[in-house]
Amino acid sequence: MKRVQTAEEREREAKKLRLLEELEDTWLPYLTPKDDEFYQQWQLKYPKLVFREAGSIPEELHKEVPEAFLTLHKHGCLFRDVVRIQGKDVLTPVSRILIGDPGCTYKYLNTRLFTVPWPVKGCTVKYTEAEIAAACQTFLKLNDYLQVETIQALEELAVREKANEDAVPLCMAEFPRAGVGPSCDDEVDLKSRAAYNVTLLNFMDPQKMPYLKEEPYFGMGKMAVSWHHDENLVDRSAVAVYSYSCEGSEDESEDESSFEGRDPDTWHVGFKISWDIETPGLTIPLHQGDCYFMLDDLNATHQHCVLAGSQPRFSSTHRVAECSTGTLDYILERCQLALQNVLNDSDDGDVSLKSFDPAVLKQGEEIHNEVEFEWLRQFWFQGNRYKLCTDWWCEPMTHLEGLWKKMESMTNAVLREVKREGLPVEQRSEILSAILVPLTVRQNLRKEWHARCQSRVVRTLPVQQKPDCRPYWEKDDPSMPLPFDLTDVVSELRGQLLEARS
């Protein structure tokens, strides 16, 4: 079954096509630091972009952070993700790992990543290697540092905006420290917008990726990451990035003036105003230990891309992930809400329900879908990658699967009820109307996830990274109250609903 694009995807694709049509065979202009107008353009059009050269960052971090990157790479902890783009599975050219607050997740391109926890107070994490534990500690230390720097940058931005000053962009230099005095409420707001709860680590060796796409609008060269807005972030929250390109990249690009445009041997980050063909884009070279910050609404109003250099590169991208529906505590609470409708459950797994109120049943089936498709299948689709670093998620996922299995029995109890003789026709119709949509969604998504686990892309993955279609069971499995394939169940429900309405 061909997937139908969402309205947002269709609009985005239409904008892209219109932009390419307007360009025809010409490139949009973009600026590099060697261009005379570069800093003026930055000041006028990109004032919420802050850059810090490596020399202004503590030397201790420059020693520890690269060691942490290399440690995780050595232990094979970074993975290319199989993401979903316009209904197709695509293997990312960049390898990633998510580190952050215990129980947090971060979703991008329809893929939910689960944190390898960093060692925060009050949480015991058992790592598979002492070196991995030390690396996670380092990224927590980097996170704390970047959080302080971000708050200071936001304070300075607030002062400049309040004074309506046309300040020189905060780049290639220390942040100003004086003359800043926000109110208590403002200070709380600034801290919340810099309260980084995860970092998404990235790695790519461009020499092993000969098929990288060309940047389509400006002619900037090979892209490691295409134009995008970072997803799933708290509104107006900042993003901080620490960049580390491996040895060799600096020596090869001493004289950038010999190039027209950006030096293709040096990694760059590119920025543009979304869907704007008038304002020149910016490309900023990224050398070892450089950092940049996207403040306030910059991530919403502008797009950015990462332009590949010639050497391998790591980055640590610190974010305030929007976790209102993305933490372990959240999904456990949702499960408990659904299970409140269980009256009795027997030793054989059968259950009876307290209420057959249509709204209660609908809510229960929607939670059933949420835990299955947003958590269990997302987790197991990524194979056994998380066990390489820690067993932290093993017990919670086993527990979630047990709760999900009880919800299967709850669905079975509802199906028994709609077949019960003597059930008033109107009540039967209301129950069927409440559960038919979530069960149809469940059937369609199970079919989709099962197909994804056998797609051409995943067949190329190493054994440890291959997706596990879980939960999955055969038709006659005595431990399961309902079949995996709900085609017949959904068809029967539709027939019953038509009969009840006739």
UniProtKB/Swiss-Prot annotation:
Binding site for 2-oxoglutarate: N202, Y292, R313, F314, S315, T317, R319
Catalytic activity: a 5'-end (N(7)-methyl 5'-triphosphoguanosine)-(N(6),2'-O-dimethyladenosine) in mRNA + 2-oxoglutarate + O2 = a 5'-end (N(7)-methyl 5'-triphosphoguanosine)-(2'-O-methyladenosine) in mRNA + formaldehyde + succinate + CO2; an N(6)-methyladenosine in mRNA + 2-oxoglutarate + O2 = an adenosine in mRNA + formaldehyde + succinate + CO2; N(6)-methyladenosine in U6 snRNA + 2-oxoglutarate + O2 = adenosine in U6 snRNA + formaldehyde + succinate + CO2; a 5'-end (N(7)-methyl 5'-triphosphoguanosine)-(N(6),2'-O-dimethyladenosine) in U6 snRNA + 2-oxoglutarate + O2 = a 5'-end (N(7)-methyl 5'-triphosphoguanosine)-(2'-O-methyladenosine) in U6 snRNA + formaldehyde + succinate + CO2
Gene designation: Fto
Phenotype caused by lack of the gene: Elevated perinatal mortality. Mice have normal body weight at birth, but show growth retardation from day 2 onwards, resulting in a weight reduction of 30-40% after 6 weeks, both in males and females. In addition, animals display reduced nose to anus length. Fat mass is reduced by 60% in males and by 23% in females. Lean body mass is reduced by 26% in males and 19% in females. White adipose tissue decreases more and more over time, while brown adipose tissue is not affected. Serum leptin levels are decreased, while serum levels of adiponectin are increased.
Activity regulation annotation text: Activated by ascorbate. Inhibited by N-oxalylglycine, fumarate and succinate.
Subunit-level organization: Monomer. May also exist as homodimer.
Protein name, entry field: Alpha-ketoglutarate-dependent dioxygenase FTO
GO CC annotation: cytoplasm; cytosol; nuclear speck; nucleus
Species this chain originates from: Mus musculus (Mouse)
Keyword terms of this UniProt record: Acetylation, Cytoplasm, Dioxygenase, Iron, Metal-binding, Nucleus, Oxidoreductase
Description of pH dependence: Optimum pH is 5.5-6.
Induction (record text): Down-regulated in fasting animals.
Highest classification ranks of the organism: Eukaryota, Metazoa, Chordata, Craniata, Vertebrata
Binding site residues for substrate: R96, Y108, H228, H229, D230, E231
Family: Belongs to the fto family.
